[in-house]
Each structure stands twice: as C-alpha cells, then as structure tokens.
C-alpha cells in the first residue's frame, strides 16, 4: 500500500522484490482511505536526467513513450520510467495525485529497481496488471 504524500521525490520508497504479473499496488489518499487504481497507466521513454527531481519533472511533461510528441501525465495517472543516468539509474513508478502538474509533497515516486518479470513496453499499460482494481 502506498499513501499519497509518503513516498516523495525527496525520499522515495524502494521495492526490491516486486513481481510483475503477481504483485499489485494499492493506493491510499493522504487520510489513509482507499482510492483505487489510477485512471491511466503508461511507460515513458527512458530518461537520462541527472537528478530524480528532474527525471520526474520530465516524466510529467512526457509520460507516454508509445506516442509521438509529448503527452503530459494527467491527474490520477501513473507512469513507469527507466532512469539511465548512473547517478539515479533504476526503474521508477510515478503516480500523479488528482491535481494537475507535479506536486513534490504529494505525488508518489517509488523505486522498483530489482523487480522480476518483464517491464511493459512503451505506451499504455493495463491497470489490472499492476494495481488493485
């Protein structure tokens, strides 16, 4: 379970044993109430940003690597991104709350480096594959 406001860009949680296709993520609001799955889930293009904050800002501007051009991360949406810069290398799950734009004190940033299974390709990802519906 992840509660908005707890796994932030300044101090992201880390999951080292996430099993793609088996494990599911359950989301909670700031008061601890269940909010269900995001409305949309995509995989962003791989990103070479030098800091996690810059990576997340760029993902908010281009959240769908399966589409040409840039598609902003919509409110109540989630995205996978692979960071390729050695300083922050890894795979991250970024989840926007219900407020447009990046809210560093509330939006979730979770490091899932160490997952098992195949990371989905760029573009749309079925919600039920990763989230409690």
Identify the residue ranges that each predicted region occupies.
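Acidic, glycine-rich calcium-binding repeat modules characteristic of RTX/beta-roll
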Residues: 1-51
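Low-complexity acidic/polar repeat-biased segments
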Residues: 52-133
